[in-house]
Amino acid sequence: MAKFPKNFLWGGATAANQYEGAYNLDGKGLSVQDVTPKGGVPASPGDRNPLITEGPTPDNLKLEGIDFYHRYKEDVALFAEMGFKVYRTSIAWSRIFPNGDELEPNEAGLQFYDNLFDELAKYGIEPLITLSHYETPLHLARQYNGWANRDLIGFYERYVRTVFTRYKDKVKYWLTFNEINSVLHAPFMSGGIATPAEELSKQDLYQAVHHELVASALATKIGHEINPDFKIGCMVLAMPAYPMTPKPEDVLAAREFENQNYLFSDIHARGKYPAYINRFFKENGIEIQFAPGDKELLAENTVDFISFSYYMSVVAAHDPENYSSGRGNLLGGILNPHLASSEWGWQIDPVGLRLVLNSFYDRYQLPLFIVENGLGAKDVLVDGPNGPTVEDDYRIDYLKQHLQQVGEALEDGVELLGYTTWGCIDLVSASTAELSKRYGFIYVDRNDDGSGTLARYKKKSFDWYKEVIATNGDSLYQD
């Protein structure tokens, strides 16, 4: 039986744009999420890009979210009841700088997060804060074309300096960008890039990547100057790729797929562009424009830890058109015949999580942090002995299998700081903008048509996860 470390950080994760609501209260500006059309943002480049409308899209569930902005005390109390040691959320950039390019921050926005962090401290819960989680201020997308414009580095610098200074005694763990590699697949949602995906050149896309990487290194530098005790990490979307066959060409295709993701963690951990990317740049006519000081900034400000989301693995082949497509998978790929799939077509692979942990740790020898993992499902509220509940044994089974593989990785020698399940309370899906895709231990009474009371109900998994935390993982190995 694997033993989890004594000070292992168990908890859950959310994002401001998916659950706070209050999109137009207390001085908050619009973000790219507020103009997301019904149906969400497609994962694949070349599909439609959300229109930058004059105002928020009226059927957008994210405008109200689950009203965490007004209910945070109730929700934090529920997290504490489960025994959370850590809670991951994000600061909405547009709540602090409504347009993104102001000189002075919005005090009401800063005060909200003061209140939230104080509430977490009351219960001894450590905040883990993402600085930018798919929430670029809309003005920066409209006026500057998001991270395609180098000016965003300066705006981001002002923002992170503001929040690092304000919360230097309240927050220890920080993430610079959520799933930073996702900008390759969802440039508007992830990078605020307004150019339609089908018109966006690889040159401009990878230049935007460079701007984000420089901004991340700059944030790491500033954070360590403001408080040397800060622990600052990068956050990537982790997705191991398996070759479809032992054919060397398929093995190479899997390696090339993984390199596109390793690029981001390599630069964060090693402080320079890896050699393997040079061929890709050359073959695609990409020439990254470095400003004076960029290389030194990257080299001197590597991260303290690597964090990642993990939902699935993919299969790669040199001739993918000859195989069935895994259309539900985040980044497409080939259907793996050996794996089951979720209701949304995401293939379920607990062993893949062990592989990711070992791959990252072998590669970097840095502490790791699993900051997203979970099962999106259509939950049904039923009457239980203690009131309405959800009999979500499928979620318990999913999480148990994944956490047992985490235990195996710990036995393998991986250094892991903690684990936060995604959407510990039901929230609006980032990719599909619906509430029926539920991840939480806590059911929120809100439906895809916007109806509902917003009441909170504990699912069966609530008590299960509470026991996992109370036993520091030992209950995972009990029938």
Identify the function of each model-found stretch.
Residues 57-70, 148-150:
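Active-site mouth loops of central-metabolism enzymes
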